[in-house]
């Protein structure tokens, strides 16, 4: 997500996976020019009594949006129909972990200057980052998380 000079990457996982995130492009771990990039990793545990479900999250998002067309198109592409949410209610989750990282010098990532331009015949580059090696970049307190999110939302 991009808001002015603030960027926020979001990754999700289920329990049992090491703290590794998949990065879909070389530029995904670079902030906008003169800006800041945070990476938020969420771990969701399947739980029949969990507080999170697609219909509830979709409803929350729809209530916050003036125009739901884009959201409905994206959810529809995944097979979700807001008129018939019952099939999705059985998939419930509990948020069991969240970690926010400041991505910058010292964060494990590929150096874009080392691989750009890509060689002829190579059009995409995906890689994984072990967040255990980014522990020093992790924002540890709820106050730090809230400040980073507030800064992201307020920058334009």
Language model: regions and residue ranges:
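Nucleic-acid endonuclease domains
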Residues: 2, 14-156
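Hydrophobic/aromatic-rich core segments of domains that either
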Residues: 8-12
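Active-site beta-strand-loop-beta-strand hairpin of nuclease catalytic cores
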Residues: 3-7
